[in-house]
Amino acid sequence: MRASKNSLSPTIQMRSSGFTLIELMVTIAVLAIIVGIAAPSISTQLANQRVKATANTLANALKEAKVESVIRRQEVAMTYRSSSTPNAIIAQDANDVVLFTYPIHQKSSVTINPSTAGTVTFRPNKIITSDKDVVYTVCDSGSSNETPKQVRINKVANISIINSGSC
């Protein structure tokens, strides 16, 4: 004989009807603990990705300006503007004509050393006009645990990215 659901006693029907409130609360509590542990590391990872993306954007913009100065056979100046919205790095030719603009993420903070080198000028002979190396240090204003990166330009216009610096 087959037993149908309707022929079962009411106490058995209630027992097999689903999750209890306690089981649901325990599941939610465990989930909250897991999310609480994972959330800080995710925010640090996102900050590191923003720093990496900004450093790569700066390096690519500088490399493009270096190539443009050789192709055009004139100086090309790169200026980082933190006062504009969004922050940007702008390339201009010798006649102050804007060649290209790269936006920088708003949560990224960039400091330049030496501070007087707000503009880096590339010459057609593949050197920069500055007598000193120029270093852009990239940090993230939304996090204090990120790994800062530096974009370095030496006198002969070699551009490199390193994991260094302090925020």
Q: For each predicted feature, which ranges?
A:
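Internal alpha-helical transmembrane segments of multi-pass membrane proteins, especially GPCRs
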Residues: 17, 23-26, 47
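Alpha-helical hydrophobic helix detector
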Residues: 25-41
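Membrane-proximal N-terminal amphipathic helix
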Residues: 44-77
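A generic beta-sheet turn/junction motif
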Residues: 71, 82-84, 142
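Type IV pilin-like appendage domain
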Residues: 75-133, 150-155, 160-167
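Right-handed beta-helix
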Residues: 131-142
